[in-house]
Amino acid sequence: MGVFTPELELLHKWEIQTDTSDEGGRILENIHQSFRSEGYSPEDTIGVGLGVPGPVDFNTGILNGAINLNWMHRKPIAAEFESLSSMKAIVDNDANVAALGEQFKGAGMGHKDVVMVTLGTGVGGGVVSNSLLIHGHGGAAGEIGHLLVDYDQRFQCNCGKKGCLETVASATGMKNLAMFYHHEHKGTRLDMAIENGTVSAKMIVEAAQEGDALGLRVIDEVAQYIAIALSHISAVTNPKYFIIGGGVSRAGRILTERIEAHYRPITFPPAYENTEIVMAELGNDAGIYGAARLVKQYLT
């Protein structure tokens, strides 16, 4: 959580525990009370920006469920928060908010057109064009993790389909690939972890960094699938920066160098000219900067 001046200078930031009991019924009240306990009141506040881990109708502030917060049904987040706090609120998907934060204050600072790809348990993203987030008519713009890139459609996605970027480029996707190719790479340092079901993305990255053949194959294939997705996005939005964030991005240059190597040969040249693939800079602070930016753009 963070508090900003009207000029979007960060004054104060802090964290609170997320209480998902009682179907997440205390979450918004706890946010409100935390602001009050830090000494902030509605009279001091232009508005509050909220990033939530689920699909949002940006125009209405209604969240279409967020399993991680135990919100299993549609929830009018903006209206509920305004009612209990007497403060204006604006709500967006957390990946969108992080993308806007990185564009405004992080790796994309100074440029109006950026795309962020967040590689975690799943794959999220946000598209910023002319300094504004693109939401689409139903709020699904930026769902980069559900671009079809694995044309063999080997792995099931949580969305119900197969072949999504999320199935081959997230932490889960890395495990999918390691298990899929294990039979071709016996003797890898990942043998035991794969056989007992404990293999993780972190293990795969570390194996690749030490030259393990299976680890390197997985990293290279992940990079190839990300490059396919970025190539498609380039032809549509032509961003200055692709910003790579999330836990999987901690692989660093071993991943981004391979993404770059696969990206340019398959991309329309005018769409990749002067486009850079960079790492996110703000970490967890991207969300608060993006939320503050939303307030500035839409509530002032």
Question: Residue locations for each model-derived region?
Answer:
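Gly/Thr-rich phosphate-binding beta-strand-loop-beta motif of the actin/hexokinase/Hsp70
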Residues: 1-11, 116-130
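General beta-strand structural signal in soluble alpha/beta enzymes
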Residues: 89-93
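A charged helix-plus-loop insertion that forms the helical arch/lid used to bind
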Residues: 61-74
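Active-site glycine-centered loops adjacent to acidic/histidine catalytic or metal-binding residues
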Residues: 94, 120, 291
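Structural signature of FAD isoalloxazine-binding scaffolds in flavoprotein oxidoreductases
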Residues: 140-144
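ATP-binding/phosphotransfer module of carbohydrate and carboxylate kinases, centering on a glycine-rich
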Residues: 1-47, 56-62, 78-87, 101-111, ...
